[in-house]
């Protein structure tokens, strides 16, 4: 009976080893240090925690100048909004005992004010003259104005044509040798009044200083016969 007790202990120890092998875990050695596993686990967790920190540092960092420029733009935008709302509040002429309307209340009141004004204008339109804007008359009026602008009416002023074009051309009388070059020429009809006469600028007739009273006129022979409008030559 005393010898069988150690045999039971060996079989129990072998069963414990078999169960440990089935579980897949290594048997704890008698001299092993369990604190190493804890240290390894801590190191692994620290590495995982350092990875996202490294990724954040990899992103491009915005410079200080860019941040300041963005802040200035944002302040300018807000300032413009506030100025616009203040102008709208002044146009609405609200009186809240010194209090300022909120932005939503200002917009709502402006919408109601515009709707009321539009209804009043549609109900009783004020008489007025024709509008000169092309947008107010539609495409038909724009087409009419385009046609009239393309073909302007002819001017009602005097004609610019030369009066000499309608009159028959009459040859000019020859100048006297003793007359100045700028003296006016005599008309062909002045031959009947006497030789050696020339018409002055005032309409009076004067005698050329070098022309004789008895001599014939200095015009070429047969001038009166060949001049137009003087009739047929005599035989």
From Swiss-Prot:
It is found in: Nucleus; Cytoplasm. Changing residue 71 to D: In MSSD; completely abolishes the transcription activation with the dimerization partners TCF3, TCF4 and TCF12. GO terms for molecular function: DNA-binding transcription factor activity, RNA polymerase II-specific; protein heterodimerization activity; RNA polymerase II transcription regulatory region sequence-specific DNA binding. It holds the Pfam family HLH. Gene3D superfamilies: Helix-loop-helix DNA-binding domain. One of its GO terms (cellular component) is cytoplasm. The keyword Cytoplasm applies. It comes from the Eukaryota. GO terms for biological process: developmental process; regulation of transcription by RNA polymerase II. Keywords: Cytoplasm, Developmental protein, Disease variant, DNA-binding, Nucleus, Transcription, Transcription regulation. Changing residue 75 to L: In MSSD; completely abolishes the transcription activation with the dimerization partners TCF3, TCF4 and TCF12. Residues 65-117 form the bHLH domain. Residues 1-69, 132-235 are annotated as: Disordered. Transcription factor, which play a role in limb development. Is an essential player in the regulatory network governing transcription of genes implicated in limb morphogenesis. Heterodimer. Efficient DNA binding requires dimerization with another bHLH protein. Interacts with TCF3, TCF4, and TCF12. This is Class A basic helix-loop-helix protein 9. It comes from Homo sapiens (Human). The gene is BHLHA9.
């Amino acid at each position: 009976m005393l010898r069988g007790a150690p045999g039971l202990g060996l079989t129990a120890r072998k069963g414990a080893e078999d169960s440990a092998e089935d579980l897949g875990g290594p048997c704890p050695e008698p001299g092993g240090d369990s604190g190493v596993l804890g240290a390894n686990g801590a190191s692994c967790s620290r590495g995982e925690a350092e990875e996202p920190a490294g990724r954040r540092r990899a992103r491009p960092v915005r410079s200080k100048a860019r941040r300041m420029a963005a802040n200035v733009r944002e302040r300018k935008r807000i300032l413009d909004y506030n100025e616009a709302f203040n102008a709208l509040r002044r146009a609405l002429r609200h009186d809240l005992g010194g209090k300022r309307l909120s932005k939503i209340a200002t917009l709502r009141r402006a919408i109601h004010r515009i709707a009321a004004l539009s209804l009043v204008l549609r109900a009783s339109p004020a008489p007025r003259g024709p509008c000169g804007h092309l947008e107010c008359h539609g495409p038909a009026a724009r087409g009419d104005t385009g046609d009239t602008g393309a073909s302007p009416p002819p001017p009602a002023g005097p004609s610019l044509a030369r009066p000499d074009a309608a009159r028959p051309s009459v040859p000019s009388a020859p100048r006297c040798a003793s007359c100045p070059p700028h003296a006016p020429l005599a008309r062909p009809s002045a031959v009947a009044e006497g030789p050696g006469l020339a018409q002055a600028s005032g309409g009076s007739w004067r005698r050329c200083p070098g022309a004789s009273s008895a001599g014939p006129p200095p015009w070429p022979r047969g001038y009166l016969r060949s001049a137009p409008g003087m009739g047929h030559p005599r035989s």
